[in-house]
Structure formats: C-alpha cells, structure tokens
C-alpha cells in the first residue's frame, strides 16, 4: 500500500544518513552487505580480537544550539559542578550558542565505553558521541544507553540532547 511506498522512499532518501530501524514491515534493502574489514584489533596482549566499535551508529546526538539566556544558566551549572567554563567548547549557532554534545556527555560523567561490563550496547571506546552495538544488542538496548546519556546530561546541565539518526518505528522515551 501507500504506507509501504512511503517507507521505502524515506529509507532511500535517508540511506546516506544514520538510521535506527525497528518494527515490523520495514526492510532496509539496497544498502549492501556489511564489510568485515577493520573488524579486528590488536589487544594489549598482542592478540587479534573483535573490535567492539565496529558496529557504530556514528555520532548519535546533535550538537545542541541553545539561546543566550539558557547558555547563561548552563554556564552557572557547569561552574557549580567545579568545571572550568573557559574550556567548554562553544560556537556561534543559528539563533544562539552551539555546544559540543561530546563535551557535555564527558562532563556529565559518561566515559568512553559506558556502561561497560557485558552490556551489549555502549558508548564507543574511542568517542563518547558514538553508540556501538558490541555484537548482540537489540534496538531497545541501544536506545536505553542513549536514554541514560541524554537523561544524565539533562540532569547535570539542563541541556537536552537530540538524536541525530532518524528513528523509524522506535523512540527514546521523552524526558520526565
């Protein structure tokens, strides 16, 4: 039906961008097979092991642009947390100040590889802005990591991070 045509058109239009797709009736075709190149890395012991960052969503959150008055509030929260506001990356943004999502994530206490352990989805071990499937993660598990990071940045600084990939048939629950 028309819904299937629309889904195919959206997927074709967005195929050059990141997407998280779940739900029934959606087939992502024409994207090619995943490549095995770069899937292995050398461990500190000199052994080849699977690279946990191979299957990445790339940059998961956009850099937020906030208004000047909100920026003043954010600076106060950052300063109250004992963080030097002079080192905070900030740039002129359309209609306000653009902040670095990666910096906010780091400063909110989310380190590379969060949550660690055996959880199947995590922040990349190379960059806190990328989410990775460590091999067996479900969409729900990936979005749970994204939710925890988004909520943590919100609680610490009052800045809402917005996903960069288009979420099709799934979502991150709204902030409380």
Language-model regions, residue ranges each:
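Glycine-rich, charge-dense phosphate/pyrophosphate-binding loop(s)
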Residues: 13-175
């Amino acid at each position: 039906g028309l819904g299937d045509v629309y889904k195919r058109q959206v997927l074709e239009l967005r195929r050059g961008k990141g997407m998280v797709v779940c739900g029934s009736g959606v087939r992502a075709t024409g994207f090619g097979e995943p490549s095995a190149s770069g899937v292995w890395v050398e461990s500190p012991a000199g052994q080849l092991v699977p690279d946990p960052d191979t299957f990445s969503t790339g940059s998961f959150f956009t850099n937020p642009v906030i208004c000047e008055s909100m920026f003043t509030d954010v600076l106060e929260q950052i300063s109250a947390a004992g963080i030097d506001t002079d080192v905070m990356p900030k740039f002129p943004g359309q209609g306000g100040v653009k902040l670095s999502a990666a910096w906010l994530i780091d400063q909110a206490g989310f380190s590379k590889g969060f949550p660690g352990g055996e959880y199947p989805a995590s922040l990349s071990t190379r960059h806190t802005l990328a989410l990775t499937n460590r091999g067996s993660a479900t969409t729900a598990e990936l979005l749970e990591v994204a939710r925890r990071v988004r909520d943590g940045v919100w609680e610490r600084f009052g800045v809402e991070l917005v996903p960069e990939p288009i979420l099709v048939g799934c979502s991150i629950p709204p902030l409380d």
